[in-house]
Amino acid sequence: MDPYSSGEELVVKTRKPYTITKQRERWTEEEHNRFLEALKLYGRAWQRIEEHIGTKTAVQIRSHAQKFFTKLEKEALIKGVPISEALDIEIPPPRPKRKPSNPYPRKTSIAVPTSQVGTKDGKLSTPFPSICENRNLLDLEKEPIIESVGGNEKLSNVQENQNKKNFSQGFTLFKEGASAASVSLGKSSQTLAEPTDSCTLNESVSVSKGVINHDVANKSFPAVESKGHQQLDILDAKQSFQFDSSCNTSSVGKSCQSNEKWAQGEQKDQPSQPDHFEEFSRNDMQVPHNYPRHVPVHILDGTLGANGAQTTPDMFYHKSVSHQVGGLQGLSDMYTNPASSATSEQHSNAARSSIHQSFPCFHPIFTPIRDPDDYRSFLQLSSTFSSLVVSALLQNPAAHAAASFAASFWPYANMEAPVDSTGNNTASQINSAPSMAAIAAATVAAATAWWAAHGLLPLCSPFHSSLTCVPTSATSMQVDVCQPKEGKSEGREGTHNSPPHVQQPGPECSEALQEQHSASKLPTSPSSDSGESEGRNLKNGLTATDTEQGAAVTETHEPNAEKVRKQVDRSSCGSNTPSSSEVETDALEKDEKGKEEPEEPNVNLLAGDAANRRGRNCISNSNDSWKEVSEEGRMAFQALFSREVLPQSFSRSNYLKTKGNIDFEKFQQKPDEQGPSGSQLDLNDQASNICSSHQAVEENVQFLLGNKEGAEKCQPTMELGEIRLKARRTGFKPYKRCSLEAKDSRVANSSCQDEEKSCKRLRLEGEAST
């Protein structure tokens, strides 16, 4: 046996890394000698050894070399002599391994110091907690770490090299506390604060002089002026980019002019910066200019502290938003300190949050709005929206008067055109931008409060009770009483007008509502239909002078509630889908509970029930025509529970008699139910009789006359041209899909149970649904 052919005398391993499958021939002496020659010449270059041997592949050569080297080491270990003395051959050293593609540290580098591990492969490969607090690591891209002691210029060059390679990357920096944002304004040797605890998982940027490279030639990057006393800091990337009101900056794009005008108007309230800041800022302008455009920038104010920031490519400012935010004062006192007076010097320095779109994001319902600037952006919408709101209010004079009166109490400090305290606004004040914005803000706040209470806008945060002016619930009731439909469901039901008796002058309505609110709390109840919610709002919001009209509205709604309760019976025959009448019954029961126990809406319960109420409102408003149980089905349910028989055993004659009696009673009750104000109708009958009203009227006439032949004539109308369908006996059929199943005779049950002809009413297109 060739001693070099195999390593059988070695320890047999359980798993071999590679096995030759095609060529099983052993190595010959000639091949092994050429292998040894090539090994001395080329070392571990297997490709060159393959060319030198010519009969073996590189994989075979490497496998043979592995076995050969293992055999040599074992023989040298047994003899106790070096390998070079055993066979006069030196095993070439292993080639240096490739650099790992993954940034994770190996097991052997656990005890290695942090700096060595971080620069081993040119990438930051240490876990997050092991980064030193006083050292900021950089992703140098095969560049050594430069300590930040006296190395500001070197770090600027390092940043330049980094930005060339990572131009499109953003830097996610984690803020480890408020101490990272503390900056001394008196120091002239530092314009950018170094965060002591700012770290990253993948890359961490040490902030020093020259990090923000301003493009002086193009004037497209926000340039810090000499007397703006701002200091830039890279902090939390999760927050939005916030411009300080005193920062006279030029924004990206074409919004530069509006921001400069707005900032120049606010710059007079700021303290002055030392003169050497101008010289130092000029020096900073000349650092390399290839820093990425969209950099997380933090603007510090000398009086109010720091707010995290981040720029986005789609950032833009509206002129209207700038003017509105600049003119709004004192709104933060609603949450922080109700007793303190709001002055322009106190809040003009606060940072304004950027508006990425025309409408700001709503805050979650569980997190109170603690930042007054966020609340300003929440309420201050664009001038286009304000003009739309005011134009909608002008269509209803009473609603506009109420909104104007509410705007007079609104904490919107109007410096250009203040609103009169009596609520009598002239046309010039209404058309002016600040007054129009105040009216729009009050209207939006009232609608927001109503929606938050009734579930149409679940994400909106409700108002708190720390108001120093008119409470928001009273303000919402002002708008609801004087304009129940225009403010809330104007888009859905634009043709429906409010009743004439509800329109009142704005001051009287507001004063009466203030007295009512001071006497007792106003109950709020969820609504299941827009018409019912309108009636309840009118009933809750009427003043003492309209008590009689309010009683009329109450009497109008009470028969409807009783009728709904009489008509709805919960089925125990296997139909687990509630009809919309059951949903309306639940809503009316909740309404009565809310009237008996008037309580303020719980903030924690609003979030859970708001979505259900919202979905219920949308479905009941738009889809009542097909969700309603048909008239025949409702009559069959009443007959079912009164006679205690199964629906399969209904006979045609008995059902028609029962239905005729019930319809006759309903026909007598309908004229009495319409009430004094003819606009109040039975909602259930109006929705359910869309498709079957003509049939019911014809049947009622025939039953009143007692003519059986007329009933037979009416039967084809119900069957839509005598279309008789074959239906197999499958047990209980829901009356939502098959409203009536009558049999020709009860005697035919025993003979033809498999196939029986049933009178099945086809559904019209208005009711057809899957």
From Swiss-Prot:
GO cellular component, one term: nucleus
Modified residues (Phosphoserine): 6
Regulation: induction: Circadian-regulation with peak levels occurring in the morning.
Keyword Thylakoid: no
Subcellular location: Nucleus
Record key words, sorted: Biological rhythms, DNA-binding, Nucleus, Phosphoprotein, Repressor, Transcription, Transcription regulation
Principal location class: nucleus
Biased composition (Basic and acidic residues): 483-495, 555-569, 587-596
Phenotype when the gene is knocked out: Early production of scent at the end of the light period, associated with an early peak expression during the day of floral volatile benzenoids and phenylpropanoids (FVBP) pathway genes responsible for volatile precursor synthesis (e.g. EOBI, EOBII, ODO1, EPSPS, CM1, ADT, and PAL).
GO BP term, pick one: green leaf volatile biosynthetic process
Any Pfam family: Myb_DNA-binding
Biased composition (Polar residues): 513-530, 570-582
CDD domains with a match to the protein in the record: SANT (cd00167)
All residue ranges annotated as the HTH myb-type domain in the record: 19-73
Region ranges (Disordered): 89-125, 254-278, 483-628
A single MF term (Gene Ontology): transcription cis-regulatory region binding
DNA-binding region, residue range(s): 46-69
Function: Transcription repressor involved in the circadian clock. Binds to the promoter region of target genes to repress their transcription (e.g. PRR5 and GI). Regulates the timing of floral scent, by restricting the expression of ODO1 and other floral volatile benzenoids and phenylpropanoids (FVBP) pathway genes (e.g. EPSPS and IGS1) to the evening. This scent, mostly produced in the evening and night by the petals, attracts the pollinators (e.g. the night-active hawkmoth pollinator Manduca sexta). Binds to and repress ODO1 and FVBP genes (e.g.
Assembly and binders: Homodimer.
Protein name: Protein LATE ELONGATED HYPOCOTYL
Organism annotation: Petunia hybrida
Gene this chain is encoded by: LHY
